[in-house]
Amino acid sequence: MKKLVSSVLAASMVLSLAACGSSASTDTASSSEAASTSTAATTEAAGEGSGAYTGTPIKIGGIGPVTGGAAIYGTCVANSAQIAVDEINALGGDIQFELMTEDDVNDAETSVNAYNALMDDGMQILVGTVTTQPALSVVPLSYEDRVFTLTPSASGDDVISINDNDNVFQICFTDSNQGSRSAQYIDENFDSPKIAIIYKNDDQYSIGIRDNFKAEADSRGMDIVYEGTFTEASQTDFNVQLAGAQSAGADLLFLPIYYTPASVILTQANAMGYAPTFFGVDGMDGILTAENFDASLAEGVYLLTPFSADSEDEMTQNFVAEYQDRFGEIPNQFGADAYDAIYTLYQAIQAAGATADMSNEEICDALIEVMPTLAVTGLTSAGSEMTWDENGAVSKDPTAVIIENGTYVTP
C-alpha cells in the first residue's frame, strides 16, 4: 500500500509539472530522528522505479530546526522533502537527488554552522532555511558561494533581497503578502471588527507581517484598537496584553506569530473569560498538536494558509496518507512547502538542463534563468499555479481556513 500511494503521488505531481511547465522546455522524537539523518538519494526506493540509476545524484542540503521549540516545522520540512526525493528517485530518470539535512534549532549562528557543514559535504543546492531569522544569516553565504537557494518557508521579504541577492527564491508567501492579504480577508469577511494585534517584536517574521497588516488595515480604514508586543524571554505570560485588548473592546485578535506562543495566548484568554475571534497566519499551523495545549481552545480560530491537510483533492490526500504511513503524524503547511520545493527544483533542473557534474555556480546561474519561466501546480498552490518573479517572490493564492472539530474547514 505504501508503494502504491507513493507511486500515485509522484505520478500526479509529475503530471502537474508537465502540464503547467511545458513552456519552460510518530512521536516528536522518532520524527526528529528521521528528519535529522542525512539520507542518500539512491535508496531502495530508487531501485523500484522504471530504471535503476547509477550516476551521481545532485546533492541538496536542508537546514531547519528538528530540535527545540520550532522542531514541528523543521521536522516536517525534512520529512516531506525526503518523501519527494524518494518519489523522484523512484522514477528512475536521469535526475536523482541526495538529501542532506542539518539541525539549526531555529538559531542564526547554528544555522551558519549547519550551512558550512553541508558545504563541506558537497552541497550543490540549498532548500532552506526553514525560518526567517536564520535565513538572514545564511543567505549572504549562499549568495557569495553561488549556491542556488529555494526556501520552503522563510517568509521574510529581506530573505530574497538582502545584499541584492539573485540566487534565492521562496515557495512560501512573503511576510508582506501574508500581512496585507490577512487584512484584506478580514476587511471583506468580518463586519467592522475592533482589532487587536499581539506580535513578537524581536522576530523579523512577526514584525514583517504585523507591519504590512497594519499598513493595509490603515489604508482600508480598519479599526485597530490595541497593539501589544512580547519577546522570546516573555512569551509565557500574556495577561497584560490580553487585558489591554479586552479593555480596548477588541473582538478580533490578529496573531502574526508561531503556534507555541499562540497556544499560550489562547489558554490564558480562556482562563480570563476573553473570547475574541483569533486570526493567525502560516505560523499558526501546528497549534492543534502543540504540547500541553487543549486543542479544543483552537475551535473557531482562523488562519491564512496555502495548505490544509484536510483538503479533499487527490494530491493532498495522497501526500497526507504517505506522510502518516511513514511518520505517524499529520503534515503541516511547512512540510507541504518543502514537498513543493523539491518538485519545483525537479522541474527547474529539467528546464535548465542542469546536471550533477556542473559547478555550483553553473547550476545556480542556470536555475536563476529558468525560475521566472516556470508555472507549478503543487500542494500549496490552492489549485492554481505558482509562478516567480525575477526577485524570487512567489505568486499564488492564499486560503483562509477555520478550525472546526479539530480540522481545517474553508469558511
Roles of regions detected by a PLM:
Residues 21-24:
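Bacterial signal peptide processing site
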Residues 16-19:
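C-terminal motif of bacterial Sec signal peptides marking the signal peptidase cleavage site
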Residues 28, 34-411:
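Extracytosolic ligand-binding ectodomains
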Residues 1-9:
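Positively charged n-region of N-terminal signal peptides that target proteins for export
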Residues 1, 27-29:
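Universal eukaryotic N-terminal targeting presequences
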